[in-house]
Amino acid sequence: MEVRGGVGQGSAARHPPAPEPSRAAARVQAGDALPLPIRHTNLIFSALFAASLAYLMRRWREKIRSSTPLHAVGLAEMLAIFGLVASLIYLLSFFGIAFVQSIVSSGDDDEDFLVGSGSSGSAAAPSRQHAQAPAPCELLGSPAAAPEKMPEDDEEIVASVVAGKVPSYALEARLGDCRRAAGIRREALRRITGRDIEGLPLDGFDYASILGQCCELPVGYVQLPVGVAGPLLLDGRRFYLPMATTEGCLVASTNRGCKAIAESGGATSVVLRDAMTRAPVARFPTARRAAELKAFLEDPANFDTLSVVFNRSSRFARLQGVQCAMAGRNLYMRFSCSTGDAMGMNMVSKGVQNVLDFLQDDFHDMDVISISGNFCSDKKPSAVNWIEGRGKSVVCEAVIGEEVVKKVLKTDVQSLVELNTIKNLAGSAVAGALGGFNAHASNIVTAIFIATGQDPAQNVESSHCITMLEPVNAGRDLHISVTMPSIEVGTVGGGTQLASQSACLDLLGVRGASRDRPGSNARLLATVVAGGVLAGELSLLSALAAGQLVKSHMKYNRSSKDVSSTTATEKTRQREVDV
């Protein structure tokens, strides 16, 4: 989600001047002189033109055959000629004016014919919104403007959306203005539900940047605070971790862990595996036939052929292996491939589809049930991800000196080791945890994911983590490590292209794709995530061992605000600013 600091705009921006009389006059249609709507007059005159022309052509053919002079006309023919000329004048005037207006009108005037002309010519308009977004319309721009009268065109569209005549999802394509579409959809939502969402910002966001790739049917955007923890000294480099969160103490705690790591010489990391997976499921008439395909896919002699077919999907996609499992006559095929700096779900799905099409030639009785059979496994806790890994498999470790444990973390090595064994290892086993042998890895993973434009839902498997603490150097120092087998991140595609998220990636030095070493930016981001988890685990376990958790959360993570009165005060202040 895009996070912007300044949402409010000046009253001048929210209340654009009324159209000049000359511009309003330029929008006059040829059918405005008639009492019927334009589409009805167009239909009538088009039918009159066609009928008159057909009648005259038929009569003239009859006169030629009977050698009757063409200039000898009766009353019916005179009426037909009159209708032909009148309809021709109307149609030429209507389409002529529309053509001239399409040339001389500015980009902001293209929306005036929405209801009359449909979606013609508006498909390319959203791409221009980034260059210059139009001023928000009245009523939709701010809460203070709500009681004012809407522009007539917008009022008609809102009414059509509320009545179900115009689908809400089609507004961007028909209007060619993503900001205006969001405002109209927002007003329609208010009228349908009877509830105000004025606390949800509308202005200050580039809606064209999410069209067709990040979010559908937008009505605003959510603001989240972004804190910075660090520096995290990792592999000899310093990183400042952007964390989008609403949980008090989280950034401060991670920051303390970063300090302890830095004062102990830093942390090191290693990427064990880099492969995104997709597992389609196919059904066969018999289990024997399913086993035959399983044997074919797992035969090393066939790997090169499968690789050629799979790798056609992208210049970055490289097939690494195929792992199969059977359930009756159903075959689950787990394809693994490298995906460069992209998270890679779309890339691997395309490659899998190529292979399935190829296999269909030799296995005609294969019935592909789904491109995803949950053996992948995406956005779900699973043993296959915990054991085999998915995305980037990373181990991050550090040795924390005895003095740092005492001065920075306010505890001792023995207490930390004992707590980790009883809580993270034994306690998680008692709970039957799957990949949850840690204190709060998900906190750090999710905060960094949201800040850097990753898929927050993939926090499920990306937070799989086992935290290990051991005494070293005769028990004086502490060795801490986190092993995370399935960190699913990318530095291109999806939400990474949004301005705020792109800025956070730039802060880490991993924005975009690496030209020299494809995939290195995504791998570096994965190690930074693991390093942040290492710092967060170290600090939280220390707080638990020292008995500081409740005290710190009551101080920094407990709201004492009267929300209702605060909201009312903020609304009053906003109205005063608007006035």
Swiss-Prot record:
Q: What GO CC terms are in its UniProt record?
A: endoplasmic reticulum membrane; peroxisomal membrane
Record-annotated membrane-spanning stretches: 36-56, 80-100, 524-544
Give the UniProt subcellular location, in the record's own words.
Answer: Endoplasmic reticulum membrane
List the carbohydrate attachment sites: N311, N557
Supply the Gene3D superfamilies for this chain: 3-hydroxy-3-methylglutaryl-coenzyme A Reductase, Chain A, domain 2 (3.90.770.10), HMGR, N-terminal domain (1.10.3270.10), Hydroxymethylglutaryl-CoA reductase, class I/II, NAD/NADP-binding domain (3.30.70.420)
**Which intervals carry biased composition (Basic and acidic residues)?**
570-579
Q: GO biological process: what's one of them? A: sterol biosynthetic process
UniProt keyword list = Endoplasmic reticulum, Glycoprotein, Isoprene biosynthesis, Membrane, NADP, Oxidoreductase, Transmembrane, Transmembrane helix
Primary enzyme class: oxidoreductase
Kindly identify the residues recorded as the active site: E247 (charge relay system), K379 (charge relay system), D455 (charge relay system), H553 (proton donor)
Q: What is its EC number?
A: 1.1.1.34
Q: What does this protein do?
A: Catalyzes the synthesis of mevalonate. The specific precursor of all isoprenoid compounds present in plants.
**What name goes with this protein?**
3-hydroxy-3-methylglutaryl-coenzyme A reductase
Give the species this sequence originates from: Zea mays (Maize)
Its gene is HMGR
